[in-house]
Regions:
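Conserved hydrophobic core element of enzyme catalytic domains
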Residues: 284-389
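A short glycine-rich, hydrophobically flanked beta-strand micro-motif that places a catalytic Asp/Glu
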Residues: 139, 170-175, 319-327
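Short Lys/Arg-enriched alpha/beta "domain-start" segment
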Residues: 2-54, 149, 156
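Contiguous alpha-helical scaffold segments within structured protein domains
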Residues: 93-118, 124, 144-149, 203, ...
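Non-catalytic accessory segments adjacent to catalytic cores
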Residues: 43-154, 248-251
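Conserved hydrophobic/aromatic pocket- or pore-lining residues that grip, position, or stack substrates
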Residues: 134, 192, 239
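A glycine-rich phosphate-binding loop feature that marks nucleotide/adenosyl-phosphate handling sites
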Residues: 175-182, 241-242, 258-266, 325-328
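An anion-binding catalytic pocket shared by soluble metabolic enzymes
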Residues: 31-37, 41-44, 148-233, 252, ...
């Protein structure tokens, strides 16, 4: 059942009772140059469709507690966009986790670009030298994979497939006219979250290994083994979050972890931090910490400014919305913002579709360039398995 939560402009289709109708609404809004987002929160059986007929606006401040209900989107570097919830639909969905299926098998139809391979491993090697020289402790380098395929591409069908494949992720489809592309993500990483009871939450997510062993069997989280490099990489993110807490003299927090979690075809190390903002009378915490945390050590590096400068030098592509953040704010007095990982930018024209996948990895002194390359391959496959099958 679909519930109309807010007013729907008369220019939009009035009968919305199925995925097909949501598809019509998506196409109509895109034609009218409106902004929109469709999402499903982790482990949720509800999906939402938000429309802003103005196309959204850029923001100069992040006073989250003063925002109306809407959807916030920020690039890696730059001002965020805000989509106001002029129209907000909610629908219950049936979810089934896909385990041991084709979504977890290696892809054979994605050609490896040797030039990209050489460029990426070269800059990983250069990054290791910089770390050994003491210029920074950690840096996150990313790359892209571009794939073209013919025929019509259904954003909402892809969204539904991602929801089914990755029930523990935040799954989102997004369109902002000023950006001109559609974005899809299935991200495991919470950046800033606060529920209606005032419990604030953020996580440190880093360290990556395949969830599939050489025999094709799934590795359970409790059986994962982590190298010193991966443990240290995740520890950098934990220390970064705690340093942000110290900057605002926040001492009353709970830290749980690290523990191994399954995110699609990958395993990660995760530590969770929670704060009771009602007890502390600190309702402004989400907005304050959002400004301090982003971009985190998990998608940038340590120290932050040195890492950002190195990324600009090493990466040939613009990250755009990759490694930024996105999510609904002030819907039911809750905030859910996630790091935009496991993401793809989709451009359609003349019956063809071009998908640009983004993936990155944390480089430390103990990194191996070829292993880091393979990590990005696995991360790209998170979405490739769904969109290209």
């Amino acid at each position: 059942m679909v519930i109309l939560i807010l007013n729907m402009p008369n220019t939009l289709p009035q009968t919305l009772t199925s995925l097909l109708d949501w598809e019509q609404l998506w196409q109509h809004t895109q034609q009218k140059r409106g902004g929109m987002a469709v999402w499903r929160l982790p482990k949720s059986d509800k999906r939402y469709f938000l429309v802003d007929s103005t196309g959204g606006e850029k923001l100069g401040s992040l006073d989250l507690e003063t925002f109306p209900a809407g959807f916030l989107v920020a690039p890696f570097i730059g001002l965020p966009y805000f989509l106001k919830a002029e129209t907000l639909l909610e629908e219950s969905i049936v979810q089934e986790e896909v385990v041991g299926s084709s979504l977890l098998k290696p892809l054979h139809n994605v050609e490896e670009n040797e030039e990209k391979h050489q460029h990426f491993t070269h800059w990983v090697s250069e990054s290791i030298k910089e770390i050994q020289s003491g210029h920074f402790q950690k840096v996150v380098l990313s790359r892209t994979d571009e794939v073209e395929f013919p025929g019509d591409f259904s954003t909402l069908k892809a969204f539904g497939q991602l929801c089914q494949a990755y029930p523990n992720a935040f799954v989102c489809a997004l369109y902002i006219p000023e950006l001109g592309s559609t974005w899809l993500c299935a991200t495991p990483e919470t950046l800033v979250e606060q529920n209606a009871q005032g419990i604030f939450r953020t996580i440190a997510l880093a360290g990556t290994q395949s969830a599939i062993d050489p025999l094709g069997e799934i590795i359970l989280p409790q059986n994962a083994r982590w190298s010193q490099k991966e443990i240290e990489e995740q520890a950098y993110v934990c220390r970064y979050i705690i340093e942000c807490f110290k900057k605002i003299r926040l001492r009353e927090y709970q830290e749980i972890g690290p523990k191994t979690i399954l995110a699609g075809n990958l395993l990660h190390l995760k530590t969770e931090f929670t704060v009771d903002t009602q007890t502390l009378n600190f309702s402004q915490l989400p907005g304050i910490l959002l400004s301090l945390l982003h971009p985190t050590s998990a998608i940038c590096g340590t120290p932050k400014e040195e890492a950002i400068a190195w990324i600009a030098k090493a990466e040939k592509h613009a990250r755009e919305l990759y490694s930024g953040y996105l999510g609904p704010v002030n819907l039911g007095d809750e905030i859910h913002l996630f790091v935009n990982l496991r993401t793809v930018k989709v451009d359609q024209s003349e019956g063809k579709c071009r998908a640009t996948y983004f993936a990155g990895c944390g480089i430390t002194e103990d990194s191996d360039p070829e292993k880091e390359w393979q990590e990005t391959v696995m991360k790209c496959q998170t979405l490739q398995r769904v969109l290209e099958n």
